[in-house]
């Protein structure tokens, strides 16, 4: 792979190659997968797995960050003929935090058409789904979720699938369409992010994970943030949120979007606050609306909107141990108290939905009153906001806008299930997207672990997407190594949840690795793992020679105490001494 402009490279995983599965419904839909080859003589077929890394791990692709990735969905939009190009708003100095001259990140120079829905047209995936239309995006995600499983009759509708929460043996585009029409799943993909490979978020599909990146007023740069994005998707992040709060927000986001094959989410309130020099009281609806349109035209796929934090709910937090811990929530609470009025996000929610509908932006309804400590878990403030999010969901659905619901937070294990049950009931089964939750507050530096415990549980109970937590949570801005640790930790949690849910094909990789382990196929063990580099490095710390990867033991047990080696001996002895006949009664 050729590198230009930025020193960023993600080579393919060892013994892996990028393959593409062609749709039988759409000639211009090719879905990427990763194929893991196993040792010759193992009698194991190559294993196909879900792949989020985009073109960055395709050895036949030349990456030029100054040009961005291929616009794979423009042909689909063109065929539907329900969008139009127009002149976008001009970039203003305040869009980049009033950054000028040498302090300004250079603008992304490659121009592209800015699209919006034609007047009166509903161009969201939910609108198509409700109209009974199967889109290329729906077909794409069905193929992805099947992880290479061939479907002989793609057009066969699953007429018995209704809104009953069942997981099918085989995903079809019709099943995907039905889930989106019900509001139980979303495909977050702005029409202005044609580089994005469609993916689906819903509890009847693979549990997805999100990785947060973003610069701050203190640290980080455009190159670092693109590097983090590419690194996060290499290790398995399904979406990325750009939570930048410093200068150059607009330009950094443009570079990220043009080079991202996964959906990008934002919290528009952060940029709006930068436009008023960080003074929450000076925020206005007009400034926020302008920010929404700015980001919509760039191609942001989903917005976190803290419209559920209402003025009457703020006093409910007075006796909390940690008060309001959401950045967006605290900003809006401060604004509401200063102006003694209802949140402008709540008051103008219909208009927010109109903007989202125009570009097919999904709304992630933010939990501004999530608990920031286990002492505050499941309190009145949290569930009052959750009920409001359910009311807002119906407003969005009435306009065919896709919605997911954000959730906590800090929740001890015995209170996690109630969160899922309340969300399904109050929010009408819209996808749940949770931060962890963290199950204890005593482990700064290890909160990727405290939260992964809760994440695995709530994913099992029905959460559709998990927002990763890194070791730096509560302590500082994550670096590249923290991003990798957070992503892999959450891939483990999500996969554990998929196994518990009984997701089709979820256990195939586990079984393949277990067989490799029992057969002492060390290279296959490494290559089937989530992090082959670390697995191999740990093995090689004590047994570094290539010949050591052929022996039937590791340094943990040695040759005499290896239980699996002894199991092989037992099986061999049993085969040799097996009596003739059925072994019952005497032979005549």
UniProtKB/Swiss-Prot annotation:
Belongs to the ThiC family. GO terms for molecular function: 4 iron, 4 sulfur cluster binding; carbon-carbon lyase activity; zinc ion binding. [4Fe-4S] cluster binds at residues 554, 557, 562. Binds 1 [4Fe-4S] cluster per subunit. The cluster is coordinated with 3 cysteines and an exchangeable S-adenosyl-L-methionine. Zn(2+) binds at residues 410, 474. Catalyzes the synthesis of the hydroxymethylpyrimidine phosphate (HMP-P) moiety of thiamine from aminoimidazole ribotide (AIR) in a radical S-adenosyl-L-methionine (SAM)-dependent reaction. Pathway: Cofactor biosynthesis; thiamine diphosphate biosynthesis. Its cofactor is [4Fe-4S] cluster. This is Phosphomethylpyrimidine synthase. The gene is thiC. It comes from Bartonella quintana (strain Toulouse). Keywords: 4Fe-4S, Iron, Iron-sulfur, Lyase, Metal-binding, S-adenosyl-L-methionine, Thiamine biosynthesis, Zinc. Disulfide bonds: none annotated. GO terms for biological process: thiamine biosynthetic process; thiamine diphosphate biosynthetic process.
